[in-house]
Amino acid sequence: MGAMELEENTVQIRDDFDPDKILESGQCFRPRKQVEGWYRFVSGRQLLYLRPLRSGTYTVRCEPGAWETFWHGYFDLGRSYAALRGKLDSRDDFLQRAMEYGRGIRVLRQDEWEMLVSFIISQRKSIPAIRRAVELLSERFGERLGSDSEGPVYAFPTAEALCCAGEQALQECGLGYRTRYVLHAAQQAAEGTLDLKKLASLPDEALFARLMELDGVGKKVANCVCLFGYGRVGRVPVDVWIERLIRDEFAGQDPFPQFGLEAGIVQQYLFFYKRSVG
């Protein structure tokens, strides 16, 4: 598979898990489906290949020990999504349909820096356009991790790498007006005035407030970073799809406060369903 030493193992996942739905759930932009049923996930410097064998059984290729120490947390496998669906499925017919339709989605715990840059880029962009921009950044400025049937595989670029790249090079990756926001965040992260790892110790509201201080970060982007980068599953990003859902399905009344610390997971079911079936 290239430069990284990858070890192949068979693992069991007994809870809801559907890689196709995860890839299409709008929370991740680099994972992809490959030939012969393989899925590739890249997060930080970690690389995973996963292929379903039979119900609940998967072949995985990753660095030795990384399935237990990294990918188990990345896929939030310590939480029972089946139990969550069972607890909530009688509250609302629309919610019940959405959870059944989205069964297999999981909220990924992704790299904080990658999530910050990706969701700054995401503003007023389609998901395919976000994927192209994020992949171009990785190919041009990220560290090469290895290669597979599709060619070289790269890590997402560090803040230092983006600073060195400069404005023109980032513009060429399709960032548009978002370039200056990404560069400003990269400069702060490279200088140490923005330490995303340290922010993990903050409570939800303080974390959200600190992210909101960054140029180009509004409520939606800050909540996306909280949810998908820090695992704060009570946070609810509100985009045009969620706005429509609240208007059309809940008579304009925000349904998410009733779901408390699991509202962000419910949001993923509803977002996926609304975006898929309208």
Predicted ranges, named:
Residues 1-278:
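HhH-family (HhH-GPD) DNA N-glycosylase catalytic core used in base-excision repair
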